[in-house]
């Protein structure tokens, strides 16, 4: 389980991104780079990281399912993800 502070930090970045999204787009179109640099650093979409919905893990994230590899395996073995079976050959 990820630390609560890390998860809260990611949520804060998401809120800042949503708040400054239109302003950032407008400044890019007008090519006002100095004003763009004055926006908060965390309002940039590149600063956001994907996190597992269940445990908050950042690495090993599977975009298609929204969970990390460990939680994915647990859910798949429990049969909670439709259409996913353990490979056998």
UniProtKB/Swiss-Prot annotation:
Entry annotated with the keyword Cell membrane: no
Cofactor note: Binds 1 zinc ion per subunit.
Matches recorded under SUPFAM superfamilies: Glucocorticoid receptor-like (DNA-binding domain)
Binding site for Zn(2+): 52, 55, 68, 71
Alphabetized InterPro entries for the sequence: Ribosomal_uS14 (IPR001209), Ribosomal_uS14_bac/plastid (IPR023036), Ribosomal_uS14_bact (IPR023053), Ribosomal_uS14_CS (IPR018271), Ribosomal_uS14_sf (IPR043140)
Entries under PROSITE patterns matching the protein: RIBOSOMAL_S14 (PS00527)
Record note on quaternary structure: Part of the 30S ribosomal subunit. Contacts proteins S3 and S10.
Purpose of the protein: Binds 16S rRNA, required for the assembly of 30S particles and may also be responsible for determining the conformation of the 16S rRNA at the A site.
GO biological process, one term: translation
Molecular function as annotated in GO: metal ion binding; rRNA binding; structural constituent of ribosome
The protein's name: Small ribosomal subunit protein uS14
Domain of life: Bacteria
Pfam families the UniProt entry points to: Ribosomal_S14
Annotated Gene Ontology cellular component terms: cytoplasm; small ribosomal subunit
Entry keyword set: Metal-binding, Ribonucleoprotein, Ribosomal protein, RNA-binding, rRNA-binding, Zinc
Family of this protein: Belongs to the universal ribosomal protein uS14 family.
Protein source organism: Salinibacter ruber (strain DSM 13855 / M31)
Cofactors: Zn(2+)
